[in-house]
């Protein structure tokens, strides 16, 4: 049984003003869907699932596409060892595509993730 488009869309619409985009990293198909959704109708803001410290370097790198790059932020883990947090800047990344389209369409962006010194991975249990 096929799911109608309006039913599928309503699953991700929390209110008339808030809509969710589920993302799959590294999927060109998902990046294309993000592009189409952002250009099909008007949005007030794009919530970016990254901390505000990524905003300036990431948006500069997005303006430099088609050059693929990576944004790297040095950090320390719980034991104090050097580690990094990184974001690949590739148009096949749905987050990058969303930022790219939002910048081109004049849609404001809000970087909404917390700034953390140590990221503790939480294993997914199915």
Predicted regions and their residues:
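Compositional signal for N-terminal targeting/processing segments
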Residues: 1-126
């Amino acid at each position: 049984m096929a799911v109608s488009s309006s039913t599928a869309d309503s699953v991700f619409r929390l209110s008339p003003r808030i809509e969710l985009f589920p993302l799959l990293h590294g999927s060109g198909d998902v990046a294309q869907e993000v592009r189409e959704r952002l250009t099909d109708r008007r949005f007030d803001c794009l919530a970016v699932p990254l901390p505000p410290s990524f905003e300036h370097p990431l948006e500069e790198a997005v303006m430099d596409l088609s050059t693929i790059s990576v944004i790297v932020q040095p950090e320390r883990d719980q034991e104090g060892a050097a580690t990094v947090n990184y974001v690949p800047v590739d148009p096949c990344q749905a987050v990058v595509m969303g930022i790219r389209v939002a910048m081109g369409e004049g849609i404001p962006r809000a970087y909404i993730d917390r700034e953390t010194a140590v990221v503790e991975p939480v294993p997914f249990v199915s």
